[in-house]
């Protein structure tokens, strides 16, 4: 048999026991670290060459290889890369490498076995939930007609689902159903929670039980819908009809306002801004009954938009004003809002009708709502929401002008104020038309337009007719701006 070939060793430096990937890199390392002259920094190839260089050039004797580990500083050994290394050192190197490889393999196998054992232990010791043991003293649940029994809750009283971890069980002697609830909703009730010594049944979904005066939910209704309005003549269910049960601290019944039989109670709307838009204001004969029903109604969800407008019965004219001759009665004693700064006390509009055309009547502005504060120096005043600040400012006396009504012709030229076209207000006429263009005097630039009876230049045309189409300069030449004198025209047409 042939001799077994020795395994080629990885390049390594005999002087410092450092491994390298390539022998060329090893040679460069030896020239830079071990065979370099410390005087002239010349890189030599072997240890004996370094010693000869230092003796001949620098007249110095070197007896050890620089940067070498102890025991391998022999300067007489001629080592170039992997060549020249003693055989015993090569064998020792092989033995150390084999020992290192065996140790690494053993460690790797041990790590793999540990991971496998950990996986097996984790799989074997899986989490098993403990079964819920039924409490003593309870009877098995009875099946309700039309509803399947609750699965996974043996030994629990009827109407209670299985308790979650960390929730205390029910106290004995406590009824599972609220008084006044229908029997079909037993399984929709959750456990009780104790607040300040009072036990309150909490329905599923986080809803509070119905308060006094509100009927309970019917079977099949979603929880978000409002309760049905009872018919006239049937009083709603109140707190007095609830049956007191032993073991529960009953709250005292809240005082409810007396609601007359023919008037249905006003329920809280889902959208108060849209709910009160269609709330009609009745006549003065039923104002007292409305005040009682409004005082018994609940507060609105959004007080900023609630009570913003109140619709008035009767037809509406062309100028969006009511045509009824008698003013509508306003509601008295409205419910106190939560935020009085965003609401108004009362707002009513009165109008008068005319046989030919409806004239805009002056709206009766109510007293601005004030917010009473604790400080004596601050006082907030909020104006009417129906009238803007510009309209309120336009009603001041200095902005009022008096114009003759359509159908009345002024006699002679009206007086002209210091500013052209602006007349001072007269106390005889109502100050309701604030911003109108100035009307030229009658007869100054011509009379009435042909074919348009009753039309005055500069005034409002009759209803249903537009202003007459007058070509330029037919109704009169354009006026110069105020403060400028018109130029004098000569006969030739030049200045």
Curated annotation (Swiss-Prot):
<dbReference type="GO" id="GO:1990047">
    <property type="term" value="C:spindle matrix"/>
</dbReference>
<feature type="region of interest" description="Disordered">
    <location>
        <begin position="252"/>
        <end position="292"/>
    </location>
</feature>
<feature type="region of interest" description="Disordered">
    <location>
        <begin position="462"/>
        <end position="495"/>
    </location>
</feature>
<keyword id="KW-0131">Cell cycle</keyword>
<comment type="function">
    <text>Kinetochore- and microtubule-binding protein that plays a key role in spindle assembly. ZNF207/BuGZ is mainly composed of disordered low-complexity regions and undergoes phase transition or coacervation to form temperature-dependent liquid droplets. Coacervation promotes microtubule bundling and concentrates tubulin, promoting microtubule polymerization and assembly of spindle and spindle matrix by concentrating its building blocks. Also acts as a regulator of mitotic chromosome alignment by mediating the stability and kinetochore loading of BUB3.</text>
</comment>
<dbReference type="GO" id="GO:0008270">
    <property type="term" value="F:zinc ion binding"/>
</dbReference>
<dbReference type="GO" id="GO:0000776">
    <property type="term" value="C:kinetochore"/>
</dbReference>
<dbReference type="GO" id="GO:0005819">
    <property type="term" value="C:spindle"/>
</dbReference>
<keyword id="KW-0863">Zinc-finger</keyword>
<keyword id="KW-0206">Cytoskeleton</keyword>
<feature type="compositionally biased region" description="Acidic residues">
    <location>
        <begin position="112"/>
        <end position="121"/>
    </location>
</feature>
<dbReference type="GO" id="GO:0046785">
    <property type="term" value="P:microtubule polymerization"/>
</dbReference>
<feature type="compositionally biased region" description="Pro residues">
    <location>
        <begin position="464"/>
        <end position="484"/>
    </location>
</feature>
<feature type="region of interest" description="Microtubule-binding region">
    <location>
        <begin position="1"/>
        <end position="92"/>
    </location>
</feature>
<feature type="region of interest" description="Disordered">
    <location>
        <begin position="99"/>
        <end position="161"/>
    </location>
</feature>
<dbReference type="GO" id="GO:0051301">
    <property type="term" value="P:cell division"/>
</dbReference>
<dbReference type="GO" id="GO:0005874">
    <property type="term" value="C:microtubule"/>
</dbReference>
<dbReference type="InterPro" id="IPR013087">
    <property type="entry name" value="Znf_C2H2_type"/>
</dbReference>
<dbReference type="GO" id="GO:0008017">
    <property type="term" value="F:microtubule binding"/>
</dbReference>
<dbReference type="GO" id="GO:0005730">
    <property type="term" value="C:nucleolus"/>
</dbReference>
<dbReference type="GO" id="GO:0008608">
    <property type="term" value="P:attachment of spindle microtubules to kinetochore"/>
</dbReference>
<dbReference type="GO" id="GO:0008201">
    <property type="term" value="F:heparin binding"/>
</dbReference>
<feature type="zinc finger region" description="C2H2-type 1">
    <location>
        <begin position="11"/>
        <end position="34"/>
    </location>
</feature>
<keyword id="KW-0862">Zinc</keyword>
<keyword id="KW-0158">Chromosome</keyword>
<feature type="compositionally biased region" description="Low complexity">
    <location>
        <begin position="326"/>
        <end position="372"/>
    </location>
</feature>
<keyword id="KW-0498">Mitosis</keyword>
<keyword id="KW-0995">Kinetochore</keyword>
<dbReference type="GO" id="GO:0001578">
    <property type="term" value="P:microtubule bundle formation"/>
</dbReference>
<feature type="region of interest" description="GLEBS">
    <location>
        <begin position="376"/>
        <end position="408"/>
    </location>
</feature>
<protein>
    <recommendedName>
        <fullName>BUB3-interacting and GLEBS motif-containing protein ZNF207</fullName>
    </recommendedName>
</protein>
<dbReference type="GO" id="GO:0051983">
    <property type="term" value="P:regulation of chromosome segregation"/>
</dbReference>
<dbReference type="GO" id="GO:0090307">
    <property type="term" value="P:mitotic spindle assembly"/>
</dbReference>
<dbReference type="GO" id="GO:0005737">
    <property type="term" value="C:cytoplasm"/>
</dbReference>
<feature type="region of interest" description="Disordered">
    <location>
        <begin position="316"/>
        <end position="372"/>
    </location>
</feature>
<dbReference type="GO" id="GO:0007094">
    <property type="term" value="P:mitotic spindle assembly checkpoint signaling"/>
</dbReference>
<keyword id="KW-0539">Nucleus</keyword>
<keyword id="KW-0132">Cell division</keyword>
<keyword id="KW-0493">Microtubule</keyword>
<keyword id="KW-0159">Chromosome partition</keyword>
<dbReference type="GO" id="GO:0005654">
    <property type="term" value="C:nucleoplasm"/>
</dbReference>
<feature type="compositionally biased region" description="Polar residues">
    <location>
        <begin position="127"/>
        <end position="136"/>
    </location>
</feature>
């Amino acid at each position: 048999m042939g001799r077994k070939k020795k395994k080629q060793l990885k390049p390594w430096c005999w002087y410092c026991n450092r491994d390298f990937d390539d022998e060329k890199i090893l040679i460069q390392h030896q020239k830079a670290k071990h065979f370099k002259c410390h005087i002239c920094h010349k890189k030599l190839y072997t240890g004996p060459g370094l010693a000869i260089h230092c003796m001949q050039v620098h007249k110095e004797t070197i007896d050890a290889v620089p940067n070498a580990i102890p025991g391998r500083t022999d300067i007489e050994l001629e080592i170039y890369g992997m060549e020249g290394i003693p055989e015993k050192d090569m064998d020792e190197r092989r033995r150390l490498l084999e020992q290192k490889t065996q140790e690494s393999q053993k460690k790797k196998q041990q790590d793999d076995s540990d991971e496998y054992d950990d996986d097996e232990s984790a799989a074997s010791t899986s989490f098993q939930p403990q079964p819920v043991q039924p409490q003593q003293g309870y009877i098995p649940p009875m099946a309700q007609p039309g509803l399947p029994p609750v699965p996974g809750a043996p030994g629990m009283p009827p109407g209670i689902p299985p308790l979650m971890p960390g929730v205390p069980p029910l106290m004995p002697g406590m009824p599972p159903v609220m008084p006044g609830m229908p029997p079909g909703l037993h399984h929709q009730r959750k456990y009780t929670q104790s607040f300040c010594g009072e036990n309150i049944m909490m329905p599923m979904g986080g809803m509070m039980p119905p308060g006094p005066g509100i009927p309970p939910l019917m079977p099949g209704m979603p929880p978000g819908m409002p309760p049905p309005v009872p018919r006239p003549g049937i009083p709603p269910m109140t707190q007095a009809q609830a049956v007191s049960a032993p073991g529960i601290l009953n709250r005292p019944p809240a005082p409810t306002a007396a609601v007359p039989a023919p008037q249905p109670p006003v329920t809280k709307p889902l959208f108060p801004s849209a709910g009160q838009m269609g709330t009609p204001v009745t006549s003065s004969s039923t104002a007292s009954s409305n005040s009682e029903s409004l005082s018994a109604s609940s507060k609105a969800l959004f007080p900023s938009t609630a009570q913003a407008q109140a619709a008035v019965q009767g037809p509406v004219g062309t100028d969006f004003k009511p045509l009824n001759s008698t003013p509508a009665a306003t509601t008295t004693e409205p419910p106190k809002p939560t935020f009085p700064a965003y609401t108004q006390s009362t707002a009513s509009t009165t109008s008068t009708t005319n046989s030919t055309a409806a004239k805009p009547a002056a709206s009766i502005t109510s007293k601005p709502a004030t917010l009473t504060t604790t400080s004596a120096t601050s006082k907030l005043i909020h104006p009417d929401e129906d009238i803007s600040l510009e309209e309120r400012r336009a009603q001041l006396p200095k902005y009022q002008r008096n114009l003759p009504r359509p159908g009345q012709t002024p006699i002679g030229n009206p007086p002209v104020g210091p500013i052209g076209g602006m007349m001072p207000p007269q106390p005889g006429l109502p100050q309701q038309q604030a911003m109108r263009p100035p009307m030229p005097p009658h007869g100054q630039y011509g009379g009435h337009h042909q074919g348009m009876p009753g039309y005055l230049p500069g005034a409002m045309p009759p209803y249903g007719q537009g202003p007459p189409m007058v070509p330029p300069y037919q109704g009169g030449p354009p006026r110069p701006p105020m403060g400028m004198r018109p130029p004098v025209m000569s006969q030739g047409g030049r200045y």
